[in-house]
Amino acid sequence: MAKITKRMRVIRDKVDATKSYDINEAVVLLKELATAKFVESVDVAINLGIDARKSDQNVRGATVLPHGTGRDIRVAVFTQGANAEAAKEAGADLIGMDDLADQVKKGIMDFDVVIASPDAMRVVGQLGTILGPRGLMPNPKVGTVTPNVAQAVKNAKAGQVRYRNDKNGIIHTTIGKVDFDAAQLKENLESLLVALKKSKPSSAKGIFIKKISISTTMGAGVSLDQGTLEASI
């Protein structure tokens, strides 16, 4: 039997696994339990009423959170010419074509998001086996393959989150840091839920958002009472 640590025991005693918490109450609880020596992220798991085995019911997209994620995002852009200048002005950290691809092939990947203009996909396409498994491959469905690379860079820097359901129909993403206040986390979560509802597949029937849980990087999940969010979603 696995040993129960002091931290796990505290979490078990504090979190009622049978209860759905008010969003504000949940945030207070997460802050109380966040005792790691770094500022933990606040992550969300959203169970969707979809059949993930059916391709037409899979959900994928991106949205900019009103208060960002609290992370300093490094952005790499594959583009050239006027788009390269626009990306630089927008705040891109790395810009290039074949030269940038060579860095990636060598394992030099000091970035969190990759954006590409359509004409650059001939170069980026060669990097699929490297970028794909890391979730970094640009995709038009989430706005990272676009002729407007400057806006994509701004979105990434502003706190855009990308989401995609897993094989169990669950969305996992971040909505901020534990040092955000409750109002900021609530507004970020509601913004994500609005985007998700807009992404609901037409073939998905019944309740779409079935369960929402939030947790910190090192903490347990706390189930939310959706009634405390209904005004916005």
Curated annotation (Swiss-Prot):
GO terms for cellular component: cytosolic large ribosomal subunit. CDD domains: Ribosomal_L1. Signal peptide: none annotated. It comes from the Bacteria. GO terms for molecular function: rRNA binding; structural constituent of ribosome; tRNA binding. Binds directly to 23S rRNA. The L1 stalk is quite mobile in the ribosome, and is involved in E site tRNA release. Protein L1 is also a translational repressor protein, it controls the translation of the L11 operon by binding to its mRNA. This is Large ribosomal subunit protein uL1. It comes from Photobacterium profundum (strain SS9).
